């Protein structure tokens, strides 16, 4: 087989495409000031790929952030 062909090359090209896609999504996320890091964004993408409704996922993330902020505020006033 010539170099750059075969299953290994295809897997490598696919991995590079996935990385590039995630980099673009992370940049969009930063532009939109979502506060999501690469790991969290990756989890969200996988959940959406599994059929989770993106709007519902967004609502859950917002509610979790509100809860976290409320807990932090309560700790600061104690």
From Swiss-Prot:
Q: Which residues cross the membrane?
A: none
Coiled-coil zones: none
Name under which the protein is recorded: Mitotic-spindle organizing protein 1
Question: Can you say where in the cell this protein is located?
Answer: Cytoplasm, Cytoskeleton, Microtubule organizing center, Centrosome; Cytoplasm, Cytoskeleton, Spindle
As recorded in Swiss-Prot or TrEMBL, the protein's gene is named: Mzt1
Native organism is Mus musculus (Mouse)
Q: Which domain of life is it from?
A: Eukaryota
Q: Which UniProt keywords apply?
A: Acetylation, Cytoplasm, Cytoskeleton
Is Cytoplasm one of the keywords?
yes
What does UniProt give as GO cellular component? centrosome; cytoplasm; gamma-tubulin ring complex; spindle
Main function: Required for the recruitment and the assembly of the gamma-tubulin ring complex (gTuRC) at the centrosome. The gTuRC regulates the minus-end nucleation of alpha-beta tubulin heterodimers that grow into microtubule protafilaments, a critical step in centrosome duplication and spindle formation.
* In-chain residues carrying the UniProt-annotated modification N-acetylalanine: 2
Assembly and interactions? Associates with the gamma-tubulin ring complex (gTuRC) consisting of TUBGCP2, TUBGCP3, TUBGCP4, TUBGCP5 and TUBGCP6 and gamma-tubulin TUBG1 or TUBG2; within the complex, interacts with TUBGCP3 and TUBGCP6 to form a luminal bridge with actin that stabilizes the initial structure during complex assembly. Interacts with TUBG1.
Q: Which family does it belong to?
A: Belongs to the MOZART1 family.
Q: Name one GO biological process term.
A: gamma-tubulin complex localization
Keyword Cytoplasm belongs to the record: yes
């Amino acid at each position: 087989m010539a170099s750059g062909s075969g299953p290994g090359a295809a897997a490598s090209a696919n991995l590079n495409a996935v990385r590039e896609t995630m980099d673009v999504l992370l940049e969009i996320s930063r532009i939109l000031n979502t506060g999501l890091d690469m790991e969290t964004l990756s989890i969200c993408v996988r959940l959406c790929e599994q059929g989770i409704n993106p709007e519902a996922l967004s609502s859950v993330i917002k509610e979790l952030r509100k809860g976290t902020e409320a807990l932090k505020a309560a700790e600061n006033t104690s």
